[in-house]
């Protein structure tokens, strides 16, 4: 039997206490700052407990649904377009993380905020500047950003034109995006995850 006096209490100094989010879940501001539409912007709310549905937790969207969502957007609720409004409230959110003692904050960068359609030659400076501000705010509190490049979303144009990752044409487009953010944030981000 283990004696309680021998059980270590608390975390070691090198333990990375923190939390995780995804751009498509928290940012909101889906058409602000030059951001283009992403696949997550078309994840309409579906009641997961709707009678007669076996599994309504998926965010799969058919071509017919996408067409309807684009033609009649006011008839549907797209919660990821709002998120928690991190885009406008990141300063107070990061201050709360610091209050909780976070040492690390795992977040993702929205590909559509950096390359609105995924096809642009140059990145969207307004989108890059937003993440500069987020990383600077983290640094202010000594919080280490751990950044995911792709967290279940991409510019909707790439799914419409190439059928997403089903087409290898996406590889150089993703590489362009990855190189842009790796170069831009090389002095602000030490830890990267390619795909969630």
Regions found by a protein language model. Name each.
Residues 54-68, 72-73, 92-196:
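Substrate-binding cleft and catalytic face of glycoside hydrolase catalytic domains
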């Amino acid at each position: 039997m283990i004696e309680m006096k021998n059980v270590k209490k608390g975390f070691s100094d090198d333990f990375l206490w923190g939390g995780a989010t995804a751009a498509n879940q928290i940012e909101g501001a889906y058409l602000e700052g030059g951001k283009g539409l992403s696949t997550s912007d078309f994840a309409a709310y579906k009641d997961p407990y709707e009678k007669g549905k076996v599994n309504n937790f998926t965010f799969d969207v058919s071509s017919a649904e996408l067409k309807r969502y684009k033609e009649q957007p006011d008839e549907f609720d797209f919660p990821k377009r709002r998120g928690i409004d991190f885009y406008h409230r990141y300063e107070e959110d990061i201050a709360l993380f610091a209050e909780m003692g976070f040492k690390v904050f795992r977040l993702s960068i929205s590909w559509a905020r950096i390359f609105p359609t995924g096809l642009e030659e140059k990145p969207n400076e307004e989108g890059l500047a937003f993440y500069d501000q987020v990383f600077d705010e983290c640094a202010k509190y000594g919080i280490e950003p751990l950044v995911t490049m792709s967290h279940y979303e991409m510019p909707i144009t790439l799914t419409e034109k190439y059928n997403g990752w089903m087409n290898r044409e996406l590889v150089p487009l993703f590489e362009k995006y990855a190189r842009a953010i790796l170069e831009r944030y090389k002095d602000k981000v030490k830890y990267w995850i390619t795909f969630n």
